[in-house]
Regions:
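Mixed-charge interfacial surface used for oligomerization/domain docking
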Residues: 3-5, 11-21, 25, 30, ...
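Class I S-adenosyl-L-methionine
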Residues: 37-106
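Short beta->alpha junction loops
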Residues: 64, 115-116
Length: 282
């Protein structure tokens, strides 16, 4: 059994089966619905979150994992003689990374990786870390490789509305107003650890999702086709099925993995959001 323990935060949005496969401990961010504080993925689900928004007209608020919470988790494994590799949502998007770094500085044998990404973009790194642990690589080598790999991540998604990003302080009011007025579905791309607006799509959500996927995958020869995530917030299952079918048609991925966006990600992207997240070739 390896003496390396992988941990990550709840924004990685991987299915429970993958966390179990690689023996990953997930540390939950917090989501506030009014005065009630919930733990992402532990005592609240995305459908429950959007039911609250619909009933109250209030948007959820998210908060980072505290330094103390990280110390508790990291310290538990260090006391067992393990080395911890922790993978975080981008430091540009949450204070979770900085809090994890501060906790790691209080302990020995804890490595904190800033994914410079979000959702299953970070999740890709969790899987790669798990595979390298299984291969018997040492922690320093794994961390160095993860820091190289994260530069090749291609993460983006298409939104029904910019309202959630705007009110969460992740998008300018002007951009939100323009997209709303023109009934555009904006594409958000992860770049340099943050988020920027890419293309804008017109028409129904289904048409926009399929146009977005063509734009990301069609005709490209720089894609690492080992694995792609199709990650989405609650939306029409028929649209998701058509999206997955189109992904398989456009590129010969060995694995196409559908995942549900967790409550932290949903709090900022809203319902009817879908993204494709993959590595580019080395």
């Amino acid at each position: 059994m390896s003496n390396i323990k992988i941990t990550c935060d709840s924004t990685c949005d991987l299915p429970q089966a993958l966390y179990a496969k690689y023996d990953v401990e997930v540390i939950a961010l917090s989501v506030a619905l009014g005065e009630e504080l919930h733990r992402d993925g532990v005592d609240i689900s995305a459908p429950e979150l959007f039911a609250y928004v619909k009933e109250s007209s209030n948007l959820p608020k998210t908060s980072a994992v505290s330094m103390g919470e990280y110390l508790d988790v990291f310290g538990k494994y260090v006391a067992e003689g393990k080395t911890v590799i922790h993978i975080n949502i981008s430091s540009s998007l949450s204070a979770s990374h900085q809090n994890a770094v501060l906790a790691a500085q209080e302990l020995e044998n804890v490595y904190v990786v800033d994914s410079r990404n979000l959702s299953t973009g970070s999740g890709h790194l969790v899987i790669e870390a798990g595979e390298m642990v299984a291969q018997g690589l040492d922690a320093a080598t794994i961390v160095a490789r993860l820091n190289e790999m994260k530069e090749r991540l291609d993460a983006s998604f298409v939104l029904q509305t910019l309202e959630y990003l705007q009110k969460g302080g992740r998008c300018s009011s002007v951009a939100a107003l323009g997209a709303r007025a023109l009934q555009l579905r904006p594409e958000i791309r992860v770049a340099d650890g943050g988020m920027g607006v890419g293309k804008k799509y017109r028409g129904s959500m289904e048409k926009s999702v399929l146009d977005y996927i063509r734009g990301r995958l069609e005709g490209r020869d720089d894609i690492d086709t080992r694995r792609i995530f199709v990650t989405h917030s609650p939306m029409d299952s028929d649209v998701v099925a058509k999206a997955i079918a189109l992904v398989k048609e456009l590129q010969p991925f060995e694995e196409v993995i559908e995942t549900d966006a967790g409550c932290t990600i949903c709090s900022h992207c809203g319902p009817n959001c879908l993204g494709v997240l993959f590595f580019k070739k080395a």
